[in-house]
Amino acid sequence: MRFSKTMRFSICAALALGVAAACSGAAERPLRGPFPLLVTPWTEDAKLDVPTLVKEAEFVNRCGAGGGIGPSAAEVLGNLSMDEYRRGLDALAARAARPDFKARLTAVCPGRSSAEALTRARLVNELQKKHNVEMALLARPPDNATNEAAIVAHYRALGEVAECPVIIQTYNGKSPQQSVASIVALAKEFPHVYGWVKEESPGGLVNGRMAELVAAKPAIKTVFSGWGAKGWLYQGRRIGTEGVVTQRAPYADLLVYIWRRIENGDADHTLLDAYSKLLLMYNLGDTLGGGSDSMRGPHLYVLQKRGIFTNRLTRVHAPKGAKNGKKWEMKDVPLSDLEKAEIDSRLEAVKPYLLKGEICPRD
């Protein structure tokens, strides 16, 4: 069959549009709702427990979360080797490629330097192609970024490398705060990469910055709450954040329940009670050890109770001069019968807001 010059031009244009659509398809799929960071599971012999990590991601997906993020940022640079990072993400990507997995698999993409973070981004590109899966990145500034120019330079370099949406995390505890104007400028320069922001500035700045970012739509597509969802009720209802990025995977179904009530204007008037139950579970860390910002400690028991984790172990660096020159040691979370009874009682109170059929007290 012969085509006229006009027909050939039309076919080429259509093919070009198709390629562009394929490249930007991930960006067009909304990223919103709860994005829990997965709690990293360990084996008794100090290895990353990859099957349990996948099981945790499956739980987050069943709960209806918008995404699942792994591995935990603090553990990436502190405890997790690059090989473990790769193996964990590879297994998660393979699972996320199956049709029943709707949550957006999101890879934490930190780095001591910009180069290290870009290495992680290239790995994600590789895994997306290998498994034919759409992913996203959660990217904070590199640890050695000492001024805004360095932060912006890193994100521009990442914008050239990343082949999926990037959620900018605005705070890493080390670098200065990036301006809202520069975040918006990046979203306009790289519209298929940027425009999603986890805003968690320190102190009293966060709510005002969120309002500025929400006002910058459509360049800014989604503003997520952070800081453990502790300000999410106000930020979601009054400012307009459209989800939360937080280390709260044991309570993914509770996060989804809260999110749906924020979305529908609290049609059944249960939002305040559900949110209070989330804070009730956070308080376990303050009461039984670990603090309210960590999902280890007593929350590992919750993951056990819900049939996700098999132990309550955490891998930590062995002290200098340790016997046999071992690099790691495993720390357990001992809980008395009284402490377990307290956790069980609180889970029972939260049960009306948890996903039916999931393992919890008296299921």
Where are these regions (language model features)?
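Bacterial N-terminal signal peptides that target proteins for export
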Residues: 1-12
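Bacterial N-terminal signal peptides
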Residues: 10-20
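Bacterial Sec-dependent signal peptides at the C-terminal "C-region" and cleavage site
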Residues: 18-28
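Active-site beta->alpha loop and helix N-cap motifs at the rims of alpha/beta catalytic domains
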Residues: 28-176
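C-terminal alpha-helical cap/extension of soluble enzyme domains
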Residues: 36-41, 64, 237-239, 248-363
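Buried hydrophobic positions in well-ordered alpha/beta secondary-structure cores of metabolic enzymes
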Residues: 46, 60, 92, 158, ...
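Short helix-capping segments at alpha-helix termini
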Residues: 95-102, 128-131, 162-164, 189-193, ...
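Catalytic alpha/beta core domains of metabolic enzymes, predominantly
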Residues: 171-292
